[in-house]
Amino acid sequence: MNVISCSFSLEHNLYETMSCLQRCSKQEELKQIHARMLKTGLMQDSYAITKFLSFCISSTSSDFLPYAQIVFDGFDRPDTFLWNLMIRGFSCSDEPERSLLLYQRMLCSSAPHNAYTFPSLLKACSNLSAFEETTQIHAQITKLGYENDVYAVNSLINSYAVTGNFKLAHLLFDRIPEPDDVSWNSVIKGYVKAGKMDIALTLFRKMAEKNAISWTTMISGYVQADMNKEALQLFHEMQNSDVEPDNVSLANALSACAQLGALEQGKWIHSYLNKTRIRMDSVLGCVLIDMYAKCGEMEEALEVFKNIKKKSVQAWTALISGYAYHGHGREAISKFMEMQKMGIKPNVITFTAVLTACSYTGLVEEGKLIFYSMERDYNLKPTIEHYGCIVDLLGRAGLLDEAKRFIQEMPLKPNAVIWGALLKACRIHKNIELGEEIGEILIAIDPYHGGRYVHKANIHAMDKKWDKAAETRRLMKEQGVAKVPGCSTISLEGTTHEFLAGDRSHPEIEKIQSKWRIMRRKLEENGYVPELEEMLLDLVDDDEREAIVHQHSEKLAITYGLIKTKPGTIIRIMKNLRVCKDCHKVTKLISKIYKRDIVMRDRTRFHHFRDGKCSCGDYW
């Protein structure tokens, strides 16, 4: 845009200025508009000043708000509206503390307050989790007679709740004779942000009339708290109410489906979007791609991607991440190259996705080339996540010495995830000496993670150092660290069934156990011998280890799926941990014996089992 070419004749000076502002996207253009406003006297016009500052504050450009501050500082006596405008602008920015600094200047200037001054200040306090400043502003509200102003009180409730002072938040809420929707939503939002979902739900149930914000706040809270089953249950309640789901609630419901692997429910929401003609914004598009990818349907994910008219870097990244989950490294790299041909610059998350894809498929040279291109070609500094991807890439490929050297030479301090990737590789490739060394480092820097002790003990046991394995196990107990239990889920007819390793709580457990005994006989007839290597930590005899391995959660979930679905139906399983060798072996055999496709998502990736083979090629 050539701002200079805009006509600034006195007759339509204001109109042309506002028109140029709407087309402004760069700071240089903004400066030219400001210069013209100074030259033509528009900076003396209160309407023009307000429009100029409002534009700067609402702009997505990070340069415009600081420039608005420079312009504002040039005024001798800004009125209350302009003070409030600037305070509001910084309260929503990456520097909310500047709202509080502006307020200090406002107090010194003797500019009068009004009811709109305090909500923005309290928003800044909430973003900073600043309890002391909240109490000071509370005192000002009381002193100036705004203690009964609904906007000020609602903002106070939210700020106290967000800063963890629920007693004060509830006290203020209880003092309101007739709380409005904003009052209810403020206190609920505070509890949600603090992760106190039980209290938030109690308050939510007490609301006489719930609006879209109320429902969305609760649903998104459950998703953020990783309570995805509860999120979907509440979303179904919302559908049965008289409140229409908005884009945010739909996006959160789809996110819950993705985490649970609830494909049918995710498809229903997608169908609902199409029927109601809800505008497919970039957020919904990305969440849909992610949902289909995480539910094992990459073809559907690709179809959604193709139908997005304006593909953002987030959409490309979601698709590349999907290919990574499924072990389609070549496809991920292909899309990574294609997005750049389309003029889309990859970001740090895109690089994490494509490097993960390389790691999961053993594309060592390709992964290294992409990693080293980050800073050289894209001016992006690799983060700890990117270094972790390379360690995992080298470790999976058996290049343990190179992985160790890479860690020692990396400019960032290696964390537990970095060392953990190398320890896992030592276990896979049976490098006992290096594994014992890394195990010591890991427990020293991450003493409260059960997996660190388990891997270290198993490394000792692989070398038949039973005393050291027992010592590691004893240390784990002394620290009060528990091993995370294996948990698998299967979604059937809108209900998610959960199984723990050795679980007997399911109402149909007897039927499951009976079916498993039949399946086990068929497995043995087809040459199945249990893989007990990964059971070494338990230090029990072979019979006990075999009994334990047969009760792994994914076996229970698959068995239940065979009972409850028709022949030929795809069985979809979610697992919270990496699938063990025995379960992987068993699932391959089940897919062949029962002629079923089985899609299993474990902690890191997808496994598609068909005709006795797995899509991972036994590389996981």
Swiss-Prot record:
Residues covered by region (Type E(+) motif): 494-524
InterPro entries membership: DYW_dom, E_motif, Eplus_motif, Pentatricopeptide_rpt, PPR_At4g14850-like_plant, TPR-like_helical_dom_sf
Presence of the UniProt keyword Magnesium in the record: no
Annotated segments matching region Type E motif: 418-493
Pfam families linked to this entry: DYW_deaminase (PF14432), E_motif (PF20431), Eplus_motif (PF20430), PPR (PF01535), PPR_2 (PF13041)
Molecular function per GO: mRNA binding; zinc ion binding
Keywords from the UniProt entry: Repeat
PROSITE patterns: PPR (PS51375)
Residue ranges of PPR repeats: 79-113, 114-148, 149-179, 180-210, 211-245, 246-280, 281-311, 312-346, 347-382, 383-413
NCBIfam families (UniProt xref): PPR
Similarity section: Belongs to the PPR family. PCMP-H subfamily.
Record-given protein name: Pentatricopeptide repeat-containing protein At5g66520
Species name: Arabidopsis thaliana
Originating gene: PCMP-H61
